[in-house]
């Protein structure tokens, strides 16, 4: 492993180690209880949210990406999961407020436990929350890289737990995977 790979692995391991245990169970409990799950983010956090949405679909959940032309209206009993490093992304705040006003539950996945979005959330998942310095600027990992990659890692581990708990098989998940590609 070269020094850059070691840097990435070291930083991400630190963030994951400082993310309190049990948030994966809380997320999965809210997903299970929801009628439908809506997922959103902005920028690279949007890309991470798409990974998670796809895996939930593979696991058999009814999931919509916010902002797509075919996304239905959110309603009471639904769940909105939003990924925002700052917890205050201006383009996402109106969506969080709208979802809340419609009676949906809100999960905010962020590097900040306290934020405007957190104030509206039913669950805040503070990735790296036990380390105040987890997201300090790191040369070679610019502009949110640490948050985005550690969030992807955390959510993939959450899916691994879901697959194990529900006894899902790769064959069963693959049968749900898109076949018009």
Swiss-Prot record:
Domain SIS: 27-168
Residue positions of the active site: 148
Chain residues that bind substrate: 45, 84-89
Leading EC class: isomerase
PROSITE patterns, per database record: SIS
Keyword list, A-Z: Carbohydrate metabolism, Isomerase
Pfam families linked to this entry: SIS
Highest rank taxon of the organism: Bacteria
UniProt pathway annotation: One-carbon metabolism; formaldehyde assimilation via RuMP pathway; D-fructose 6-phosphate from D-ribulose 5-phosphate and formaldehyde: step 2/2
EC number annotated for this UniProt entry: 5.3.1.27
GO aspect biological process, one term: carbohydrate derivative metabolic process
Family, as annotated: Belongs to the SIS family. PHI subfamily.
Subunit structure: Homodimer.
Entry protein name: 3-hexulose-6-phosphate isomerase
């Amino acid at each position: 492993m070269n020094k850059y790979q070691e840097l990435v692995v070291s930083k991400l391991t630190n963030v994951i180690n400082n993310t309190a245990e049990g948030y994966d169970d809380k997320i999965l409990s809210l997903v299970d209880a929801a009628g439908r799950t809506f997922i959103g983010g902005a920028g690279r956090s949007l890309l991470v949210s798409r990974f998670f949405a796809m895996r939930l679909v593979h696991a058999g959940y009814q999931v919509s990406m916010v902002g797509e032309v075919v996304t239905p209206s959110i309603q009471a009993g639904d769940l909105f999961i939003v990924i925002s490093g700052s917890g205050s992304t201006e383009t996402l705040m109106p969506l969080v407020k709208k979802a809340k006003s419609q009676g949906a539950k809100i999960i905010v996945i962020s590097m900040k436990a306290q934020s405007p979005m957190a104030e509206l959330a039913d669950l805040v998942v503070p990735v790296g929350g036990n380390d105040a310095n987890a997201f300090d600027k790191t040369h070679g990992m610019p502009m949110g890289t640490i948050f985005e990659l550690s969030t992807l890692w955390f959510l993939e581990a959450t899916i691994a737990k879901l697959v194990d708990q529900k006894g899902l098989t790769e064959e069963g998940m693959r049968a749900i995977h898109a076949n018009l590609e």
